[in-house]
């Protein structure tokens, strides 16, 4: 008979298939609670947790961007009544974003980072911590934005130190970290030069060791390398003309083997 932990993993997969991501988060939170403080999640479990939260936050991030864009248009037209309604609605989405980010950040700080024993799991969770502080920095303002940006930077830097020491340049988690860290420099810190340097270095180091890639991670690694290159192309053209194409980020997959 399956243990409660195995049952919750199965239910999380079921919720994912049904695209019921809020429930997927709940099942995976039960898995984290069931794992003893000193016991790591399996690679499959941590990927399921990441996918669940990424989808729940992703829907709200998309909503926030759409509403913010409409707000700008209405402001430029001088429709003050509409702007007031939009601001109120945006604030509701921001409350949801804050709650979701705080939920996973609490889990990371209280359990997941402390129980991580391997280099790849430490980098995985620290990258995740950086990602969710970055999502807060996307919409927070003033002192709250500054704090979120500082927390993002320290989490990504801690992850980068471990990744550089313990993971190959072609490792999908190391590449995914470089991708998201460079997006942070570009979007949050408005440092296109730093963003491009970080992305280019990660890409070049991976290219130099491409022949050492195992078959199981080849697809994941080359996909992220392509995203790094896409962003580099976009950013270098943006520095010449103010483009607004979509910036690529690392997206977790439930079947990652790394």
UniProtKB/Swiss-Prot annotation:
Residues 245-258 have a biased composition (Basic and acidic residues). Residues 238-258 are annotated as: Disordered. GO terms for biological process: protein localization; signal transduction. One of its GO terms (cellular component) is cytoplasm. It comes from the Eukaryota. Homodimer. Belongs to the 14-3-3 family. This is 14-3-3 protein 6. It comes from Solanum lycopersicum.
């Amino acid at each position: 008979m399956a243990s409660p932990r195995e049952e919750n993993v199965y239910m999380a997969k079921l919720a994912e298939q049904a695209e019921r991501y809020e429930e997927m988060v709940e099942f995976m939170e039960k898995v984290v609670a069931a794992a003893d403080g000193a016991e790591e999640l399996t690679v499959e479990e941590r990927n399921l947790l990441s996918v669940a939260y990424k989808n729940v936050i992703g829907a709200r991030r998309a909503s926030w961007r759409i509403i913010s864009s409409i707000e700008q248009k209405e402001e430029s037209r001088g429709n003050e009544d509409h702007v007031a309604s939009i601001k109120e609605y945006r604030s509701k989405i921001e409350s949801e974003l804050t709650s979701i980010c705080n939920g996973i950040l609490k889990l990371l700080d209280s359990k997941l980072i402390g129980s991580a024993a391997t280099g790849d799991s430490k980098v995985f969770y620290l990258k995740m911590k950086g990602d969710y502080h970055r999502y807060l920095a996307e919409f927070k303002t003033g002192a709250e934005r500054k704090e979120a940006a500082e927390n993002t930077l320290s989490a990504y830097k801690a992850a980068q130190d471990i990744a550089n020491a313990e993971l190959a340049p072609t490792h999908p988690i190391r590449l995914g970290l470089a991708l998201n860290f460079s997006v942070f420099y570009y979007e949050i810190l408005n440092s296109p030069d730093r963003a491009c340097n970080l992305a280019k270095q990660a890409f070049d180091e991976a290219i130099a060791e491409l022949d050492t890639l195992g078959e199981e991670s080849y697809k994941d690694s080359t996909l992220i390398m392509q995203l790094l290159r896409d962003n580099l192309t976009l950013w270098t053209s943006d520095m010449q003309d103010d483009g607004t194409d979509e910036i690529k980020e690392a997206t977790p997959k439930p079947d990652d083997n790394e």
